[in-house]
Each structure stands twice: as C-alpha cells, then as structure tokens.
Amino acid sequence: MKKILVLYYSMYGHIERMAEAVAEGARSVPGVEVTLKRVPETMPEEVARKAGAKLDQAAPPAEPKELADYDAILFGTPTRFGNMAGQMRNFLDQTGGLWVSGALVGKFASVFTSTGTGGGSETTITSFWHTLAHHGMVIVGLPYVLPELSDVSEPRGGSPYGAATIAGADGSRRPSEKELILASFQGAHVARLVVRMQ
C-alpha cells in the first residue's frame, strides 16, 4: 500500500476545502492510503482569531520529520504576495534534516493554492518547486486532460502547474465545483503515478 500525505495550511478554509477534494481524489485510486494533515499555525491564537482565521480545522497538525513516511506529498497553501504562506515556509524550513539524509529523494510532490483575485497562483506553486527540487522530489503538475482546465466560461483558478481557487478580494467566494474537480483530479493523478511506481 502506497502512502500519500495531503499537507496544507489554510487560514480561512479555502485551502482546507481544496485539500479535502485532493484527498478524496487520491482515495479514489486503489492501492493508496491517504492522510490529511495541516501545518501548525504560527500566529498567536488571539491574533489569528482577530484576523478571522478558521481555527476549528479537523485535520491534525503535522511534524516535518513525518514527510519521510510518505511516497507522495501534495502541498496546499494560500498565496501571500505571489509566494507560499509564511506558515508553510516555516514548516519547510524545518526539513533540513530530511535534506541531509536524502529522505525525500524520489518521492512525488505536487502543489495547489488559493488567491484573492487570481494573481500569484502560478508563482506560489513554482515558489515550492525550488525546495522540492533541492529535496530531489519528482514534481507533478496538473495535465491538460480535463475539459475543466480549458473551460473559461466562468472565473476559476487552476493551471497546468496545479489546482487553485479564487477566494475573492474579501474571501467570500468558496471553491467552485470546477475548482474542486481539478483538485480531486490532481490528487488522483498523483496517486495513479505512485501506484505505477510499485
């Protein structure tokens, strides 16, 4: 049984929902065991609460050393000025021991994101790739095999770099059905690749 981790940071719940869809997609592939975890919040609870953060997320927090236990990891983060959120960056910066030991070499990695109005989604995903490449991971995107990825009939996130959702300037927009389809497919796509490598 191949093991897949969906690891995310979500402040307002958009990436949490996308992560659930990614995990659902991965679970649809026989031969994989999927775990959903989040990176710890680095803001003091009072500050996060005042900012309107969603603090009641069901996924348990992960520890950096756990990454070595999985055959593939799908990372989810909101966009912060075209980069990953600081909480995710902080988590990844604690993986130096895994890098030294080569614990992540050859494992699959994929990234999904959210933005306010669409700007920065692709650079957020590619901002991950430097770290993943240094770890020797195999980077997986979102191929143009789904009609939803080419459908421009409504605003939506997502590109061949990875699934994405547009939250709106005030954060009120939730992931759309098409965005969730893309997220689910990304999870399934990674799972199929992992199973093939047996």
UniProtKB/Swiss-Prot annotation:
SUPFAM superfamilies: Flavoproteins (SSF52218). Residues 4-190 form the Flavodoxin-like domain. Binds 1 FMN per monomer. It comes from the Bacteria. It catalyses: a quinone + NADH + H(+) = a quinol + NAD(+); a quinone + NADPH + H(+) = a quinol + NADP(+). NAD(+) binds at residue 12. Belongs to the WrbA family. This is NAD(P)H dehydrogenase (quinone). It comes from Azotobacter vinelandii (strain DJ / ATCC BAA-1303).
